[in-house]
A protein has these predicted regions:
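Short, charged low-complexity linear motifs
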Residues: 31-35, 124, 161
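Compact, glycine/acidic-enriched structural inserts
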Residues: 114-146
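A generic secondary-structure signal for well-formed alpha-helical elements
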Residues: 42, 53, 57, 139-150
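Secreted/luminal cysteine- and crosslink-motif detector
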Residues: 16, 132, 155-156
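Acidic, proline/glycine-rich low-complexity IDRs
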Residues: 147-179
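Short helix/loop capping segments that flank catalytic or ligand/cofactor-binding pockets
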Residues: 100-103, 111-113, 125-126
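A surface-exposed partner-binding patch
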Residues: 1-102, 107-108, 167-179
Length: 179
């Protein structure tokens, strides 16, 4: 609960400092329509985020949403990267340089919904490294990184102190282990 409160505090701080206005939130009905069209269900932690922040200029680039502006729409990204839809990966944000942050919905790396980074210039359909153990912690750490220039996610000690569940995910690279 404390991380959740810190997340919304930093979202509002980001919006104030960067003069960002949040777009309208998504809805439960939109999640159901999305799942019917794509066969990819929207997990509860992402629903919680999208009911507040749905396709906004938050972070280093943009966050993605459901039934929002086309360029920030998850379904539009699926038209560009159909492999992601086939794997039931949900893109949740980009880095402003053409790379993306996604969540696996089939629990292939462990329980829950961790967030991983895809470097489209290296391997557009494979995770490059794990970023966070949960969606809300990802957005919290991302915004702290943008606003406060933290050492996330590449500093192992810093990342594990902030995200103690990080190492429970397997079969995916950690950012400090990159070549």
């Amino acid at each position: 609960m404390e991380d959740e409160m810190r997340l919304w505090d930093i979202v509002w701080r980001f919006c104030k400092e960067k003069h960002v206005t949040l777009p309208p939130p998504s809805s439960e009905a939109a999640f159901e329509r999305f799942a019917a069209r794509t066969s990819v269900p929207v997990p509860p932690p992402l629903r919680s985020w999208l009911l507040k922040v749905n396709g906004a200029a938050i972070g280093a680039g943009y966050t993605y949403g459901i039934e929002c502006d086309r360029e920030n729409e998850i379904e539009f990204l699926y038209s560009l990267r159909p492999e992601w839809a086939e794997k039931a990966w949900l893109p949740i944000a980009n880095d402003g340089c053409g790379n993306h942050y996604l969540i696996p919905t089939k629990h292939e790396y462990g329980p829950g919904y961790p967030v991983f980074f895809v470097d489209t210039s290296v391997a557009p359909n494979e995770p490059r490294y794990l970023c966070a153990s949960s969606i809300s912690l990802f957005f919290l750490l991302l915004l702290e990184w943008v606003l406060d220039d933290t050492d996330w996610p590449f500093d192992k000690e810093f990342t594990l102190r902030r995200d103690p569940e990080f190492l429970k995910f397997t079969g995916i690279r950690y950012p400090w282990d990159l070549d």
